Amino acid sequence: MLSRKRSFAALTVLLLSGAAVYLHSQSSTQTTLRNPPPDADTALLVTLGRGDSEEIDWSGHIEVENGEVVELVGYEMRAGDLIHPPRRWEAKTRPAFAFARRPHDVGILEDLSPDAFLSPRFYVYLNANPATRVTLKTAQGDAEFRADEITVGSPGSFGGGRLTVERSAFPILVGRGGESPVSQPLTDNDSASVASTVDGDTWIAWTGFRNGADRVYAEKIRAGTRRGPDAIPHAVSPKDGDVFRTAIAEDAEGKVWVTWSERVDDNWDLFARGFDGQSWSRIERLTTGSQPDTQHKMAADSEGHLHLVWQGYRNNRAAIFYNSYNVNDGWSQPEQVSADAAPNCWEPSLTIDSNDNAYVGWDQYGPNGYDVHLRGRVNGEWRAAVAVAATARMEAYLTVAADAQDRIWLAWHESGVNWGKDWGYPFDITANATGLYNSRNVRVAVYENGRLRQPTQAFEAAMPGAGPGDNFYEYPQVAVDGQNRPWVFFRYRRPAQHNVYWRTPAHHALWEIQGSYYDGAKWSSPQLIPYSTGRNDMRFEVTRDAGGELVAAWPTDRRNFRDFVNMLPDVFAARLPSPEGLNPSPQLTELRLPPAEPARQPPNRPQREMAATEPVHPNEAQDVESIRDYVYEVNGKRYKIYRGDMHRHTEISWDGYNDGSTEDTYRYAIDAASLDFIAITEHNFGVMDEYDWWRSQKFVDIFRVGASFVPLFGYERSVPYPNGHRNVIFPYRGAPLLDVQHYEWNTGQDTFAYTRQGPERFFAYLRKYKAIAMPHTSGTNMGTDWADYDPEVEPVVEIYQSDRTSYECVDCWRAAPMDDRPKQFGGYRPDGFVSVAWEKGYRLGVQASSDHLGTHTAYSMLLAEENSRDSLVDAIRQRHTYGATDNIIVDFRLVANGREYMMGEEAEISAAPRFKIHVEGTDDLGEVEIVKNNQMVYAQTPGAKTADFEYRDNELPGEEASFYYLRVRQSDRDKQVAWSSPIWVTSR
């Protein structure tokens, strides 16, 4: 018998439940794909083998007296674990999985402790009453308890804590009622919102994707039920479209309003529609700006007035806006909440206090990076905004909630200093900067009577000790229940590999939602929300009903702990159980944010002392302004330099779980890097899922801001050496992905009695869809041997990648050393260097990009007439490109035939070639070199920030083209580099 921490009477009579309803009668390895049984009334989470340091069998079965077992559903179960209905399981604690150490992982990946073992977890669904007694009979002993003894904040602990039982919220699957045609696939559901009505019903709204389009849906869960309606959900947006996020609330007349953002006439605006119990009203358009209006939240006050906040771009800057609705006057005109002069403002949150005053929280990008702000609308007038946290750390995604005393509880997540600044491959870079997803933690504060305060116990202190891959608590959602108890719900990362360091691409992970409440003195242990596994940025929405109970809705993609991949996007809802009794008055103290610390340095890099306030680029704003002001006037046309990144992953990619969310990547591009464009290029294995590809393209449109920021549509087609990885860029939305054929994976051996299948099929696909491709990491195991080339569709190569290294040539600047395997990120294939392609006569321009992890240290520079998708893609086709690791201006031209030729162009001339060179660095230029046919033919050491000169080659051009390009290296600490695209010259 496993002993329990609390004593209780031993069972004298065991009556097995004989009336169980078995929804699934077959043994199954499925976990998160199995739906919760709607005819149960109690959910318990069982964890086996906590603290085990060896593989131990915990198989067993459940027995119930005065109640019934409805179903056992696996949760955290791995290969070999099984559920055998109706009441038996097979499960073991199993060794944690370690990522295999590759040569370049030396000094990065941590060794797993030999006693690192994973505990299986499963849910028990019961029909229970105060007399129900449960026995869990396991191979390690029995656990006996009364079902009502397991409450929130009071879990059952047995066998010295090796087996635990926790009360769980009862999950309700949303949007799957009614009968849809057999020929129709299920919708991919996402972006949930929740409202509780005065009569106790719960309304959920969400977006649903199917057949290349999505809509807004809603449905009502009646009070007292644990299942959605047996009817097809309401289609709030009446036709297929392109929608983003939802918000829902009830007005004074009992009408339920849904708001959403939708792309109409190539712009995102907010729309609203109300349901009076019989029919839906006409759709009302709430915004008419020429730039995106998205990221909205809505709440109702005690009078049934609705309050709406959102992020809207005006004149290329994001601001926070507010409007309201009442049944007499309808929707008001928008008011700007953030200051006119404020920088980009993001992600508003909203709460209403007991006096119907609205408080709006948001984060904005300033000199310190992202900071969080709060502003109240008291008695109809806006008070001055309050800077809640404005340190050198990244502070973002603020949420707010009012308690019964009108204190405003605030929660946000943080990361390190200089977020999104210089972070990348070179082993000598030691900038005081933080990558996009190096860390996340949650901080909580309280705004009370004009003062900023904090709980006496920091939220972080209550979280479990983190392993290498588990130090991520993020996207908090704060709420206050009817007992005046503050809660913080958050996303928590669970990696597939348990030794992955934050400097290494993480291969597969999931995030689950957990919640913790403040009991007046301390934060509770985190409590899991069921069916909450999913991608990084799936948001949790919660409201309080008239009885004080918290009601929540959340999306999930139902990924599991075996595969860690998107499976079936769904939406769930639940009433959240709380501890009984009124919460004590919270113990608070003055808010004292800890001092900022220097950025964490990768463990395998040189370490140096630095101040937390040390800037990365003190003159960055001026450098960016200079590069944007620079004009190429060539043959009667004007070209400008548009800075971007043509190769970026997020957590949608299978190896992108240390890259952060899609939205964080756009934040980085717009704010931290001040880019003009970006192409997020998820692996085809990430976006081959139809919904992920749709969502990826949706974000490209959401974050297009006039001509100031223009994302591009693209993905990465990942085929190993010798065919190689290539990024694909489209000038438009909606092209399909191309699958990878089996024999494209042939690495050169005649394993299947076939020669390797080359990329000809891929080249045909690019022609068909008017796309272009760019090889990258060409000198690695992801690269190419340059056996195949199509100049029409493959005009440019990624010469440098800040996640890894340079691929210009062997022994060139920043190239991987040929005799140092730990510095050969991704392997070493010298036949894939760009110089080899040039030697073959391939006419490839160059650009630099990031891939994974690296930020602010690789720029794809496009010379275009305007910042539009067509113009940018045309610049790539013409090879009007160069690559740089900093904001370096490179102007490299050939003067001949009474005109000038830009980099990337071809010229037939009769005289010796003459080149004009102009370079402006961000620091002193150390070396400026001209390379002809892979040989350096000219060099100078300017020792100043500018170089302006001409170079004439005394050798006349021949029949076969010679190519010339410029490369630059600065003399600053990190020796920043730039490469022009070549100019090809032949005799006339």
Walk through the language-model features, giving the residues of each.
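Extracellular, repeat-based ectodomains that mediate carbohydrate processing or recognition
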Residues: 90-92, 100-119, 153-613
